[in-house]
Amino acid sequence: MDLRQFLMCLSLCTAFALSKPTEKKDRVHHEPQLSDKVHNDAQSFDYDHDAFLGAEEAKTFDQLTPEESKERLGMIVDKIDADKDGFVTEGELKSWIKHAQKKYIYDNVENQWQEFDLNQDGLISWDEYRNVTYGTYLDDPDPDDGFNYKQMMVRDERRFKMADKDGDLIATKEEFTAFLHPEEYDYMKDIVVQEPMEDIDKNADGFIDLEEYIGDMYSHDGNADEPEWVKTEREQFVEFRDKNRDGKMDKEETKDWILPSDYDHAEAEARHLVYESDQNKDGKLTKEEIVDKYDLFVGSQATDFGEALVRHDEF
């Protein structure tokens, strides 16, 4: 099995992941922070730049002159204004921020696209994905290397079908993104819960009991005492995870654990940007209002045009 296939299988299937005896396995999907910078506008707008552009793109703007920053910001505003009414709403800003934060996901899909789109038709069929990913293992789906490729392929096919909204077994780029990164799509939430639930539910009764819950996180090492975090997780299961106190977690309880309702950082940042930039206080932003506050949105550190780092692949 080549390295690419090995990494692909590992990224799509968690059933075979192993933990060190005292290493906690985290199944929970949290909304990522918009930036690792401190959000303090009195000191700098670095947090806002990372949130609005994504951390990597924000570094690019740091190399531009103010004039270039304003010009490129104006181009971005045209993209944010989804309904082309000349205004940017809080909702449109929130959508843009979420898009900017997920740019690494889209880049990941782009990097893999040509590898799977064998006939170069701009789509990826299930057959194309299966042949590239499993290839020679189709004839021997149960080799002696510890991987059950038949089981992995069945799981991948189920996920592919769920991502494939129109049911034609051919994925558009957006559907393929949902297949590779289901945690980012609301309509894929069930599979995000179902897959780890199947991994943890060792007795296949459709529930996760306390021992299965702990066993997924912690492998006991001989006579060693359980670390403190394991005791805490036992208490968490009894007090919070098992809401109906029947000694096990059903699908909804598992969903609440794996996909918690986190604070919406993108919504908060969109609200903040509108508040700081909305000069006439009408609850929406014009391009002029945004560009006037370019230092808040994108910033600029370069003062010499010759220092500018010019990129042509803007988003």
UniProtKB/Swiss-Prot annotation:
Positions of Ca(2+) 4 binding: 201, 203, 205, 212
Protein origin, superkingdom: Eukaryota
Signal sequence range: 1-19
Name of the protein in question: Calumenin
Organism: Bos taurus
Compartment(s) where it occurs, according to its Swiss-Prot or TrEMBL record: Endoplasmic reticulum membrane; Golgi apparatus; Secreted; Melanosome
MF term (GO), any: calcium ion binding
Residue numbers carrying N6-acetyllysine: 165
SUPFAM superfamilies in UniProt: EF-hand
Binding sites annotated in the UniProt record for Ca(2+) 5: 242, 244, 246, 248, 253
Keywords recorded for this protein, A-Z: Acetylation, Calcium, Endoplasmic reticulum, Glycoprotein, Golgi apparatus, Membrane, Metal-binding, Phosphoprotein, Repeat, Sarcoplasmic reticulum, Secreted, Signal
Assembly and binders: Interacts with GGCX.
Lineage: Eukaryota, Metazoa, Chordata, Craniata, Vertebrata
Glycosylation sites (chain numbering): 131
Residues that bear Phosphothreonine: 65, 254
Residues annotated as binding Ca(2+) 1: 81, 83, 85, 92
Gene3D superfamilies: EF-hand
Function: Involved in regulation of vitamin K-dependent carboxylation of multiple N-terminal glutamate residues. Seems to inhibit gamma-carboxylase GGCX. Binds 7 calcium ions with a low affinity.
Residues that hold Ca(2+) 6 according to the record: 278, 280, 282, 284, 289
Residues carrying Phosphotyrosine: 47
Family named by the database record: Belongs to the CREC family.
Entry binding sites for Ca(2+) 2: 117, 119, 121, 128
Modified residues (Phosphoserine): 44, 69, 261, 277
Positions with a binding annotation for Ca(2+) 3: 164, 166, 168, 175
Originating gene: CALU
